[in-house]
Amino acid sequence: MNTEASQDQTVTETPGVRLRQARESLGLTQQTVAERLCLKVSTIRDIEEDNAQANLASTFHRGYIRSYAKLVHLPEDELLPILEKQAPVRAAKVAPMQSFSLGKKHKKRDGWLMSFTWLIVLVVLGLTGAWWWQNHQAQQAEIANMVDQSSAQLSQNGGQPVPLTDDNSDAIAPTDAPAPVANGQPVPLTNHSGSAITNSATTSSVPKTTSTEPVDTANTNTTMHQEGAASAAVSPSQVPQPGMPTGQPPLPTADAGVSGSASSVGALVMNFTADCWLQVVDATGKTLFSGIQKGGAVLNLAGKAPYKLTIGAPGALTISYQGNPVDLSKFIKANRVARLTVCVE
């Protein structure tokens, strides 16, 4: 009997039972206790039934019991030893702290990725620079080679520039010496092709003997003296050369022949804005020009079309063919030696 009584007393001495008895003795309900402790009614019920919530830490559970004991005027020292025997303090499950190693790994991986990206960019830039430098060196070598070829051609020609005349045009040599006189009559001048240069004034100077009237010698001499005085008043450039008939006009010079060929059909005009190496070859294979032109120079060429042009610096000149401009923009943009053929479209 004593053993059963002690077991009943042990059962009634649980913290939940004692708190419930104290609450009932004060005439309080679970709802009232929950409102005063700012807890849920289910939490008060679990405390009175000695049910420890699995998701509730033991520290909070003990705190709720202490607050409940103060509310119903029970000493805490009597409840805590019983609570420790009934439910020992459980070690709180502490979640393992996530280290920053994962973030460091991500940063390290991002660092490697950025380094690899920069390496690719540097390699691309290096290849681009090497490609540009090789093209530049090739252009410089090509220009130097063309200049050497031009110098060699000039040395083979005896240092004389290439003549700028058309193959079909006959060059007229200048006649600075007076025309020879044979038996009192002027000898007709001939050009390189052997054709005689005649003048209508020479023909008209021969008197026609169609009239039978006598000629007054005195009047004729007077007239000749008057004509001599009138010719003395003429400018020196109009004075006839010795041995040349008075009424004969001056012969055309070589300058007139050059200007005529420059203004002929198929003329090629080049205006230079800077120093530039140039080579022009016509359809017959004749080199019309090969060398360096200074800035500000104007070059007029005439030959048999089409023309093959090799230009060292396309941006240093403008070209017009038969009055129409020649487009060099693609060579200027590419920054390379221009090789083109100019012909009638």
From Swiss-Prot:
SMART domains: HTH_XRE (SM00530)
Membrane-spanning segments: 112-132
Polar residues biased stretches: 188-225
Topology, Periplasmic side: 133-345
InterPro entries, per the entry: Bact_Cytoskel_RodZ (IPR050400), Cro/C1-type_HTH (IPR001387), Lambda_DNA-bd_dom_sf (IPR010982), RodZ (IPR023690), RodZ-like_C (IPR025194)
Location in or out of the cell: Cell inner membrane
Domain HTH cro/C1-type: 19-79
UniProt key word Nucleus: no
UniProt keyword annotation of Lyase present: no
Disulphide bond pairs: none
DNA-binding region listed in the record: 30-49
SUPFAM superfamilies per the UniProt record, alphabetical: lambda repressor-like DNA-binding domains (SSF47413)
Gene3D superfamilies given in the database record: lambda repressor-like DNA-binding domains
Domain remarks: The helix-turn-helix (HTH) motif in the cytoplasmic domain of the N-terminus is involved in the formation of spirals to maintain the rigid rod shape. As this protein is anchored in the cytoplasmic membrane, the HTH motif may contribute to protein-protein interactions to form the RodZ helix, which is localized beneath the cytoplasmic membrane. The C-terminal domain may be critical for determination of the rod shape by probably interacting with enzymes required for synthesis of the peptidoglycan layer, including PBPs in the periplasm.
Described function: Cytoskeletal protein that is involved in cell-shape control through regulation of the length of the long axis.
Assigned protein family: Belongs to the RodZ family.
Entries under HAMAP family matching the protein: RodZ
Protein name as annotated: Cytoskeleton protein RodZ
Protein species of origin: Yersinia pestis
Lineage summary: Bacteria, Pseudomonadati, Pseudomonadota, Gammaproteobacteria, Enterobacterales
Recorded name of the encoding gene: rodZ
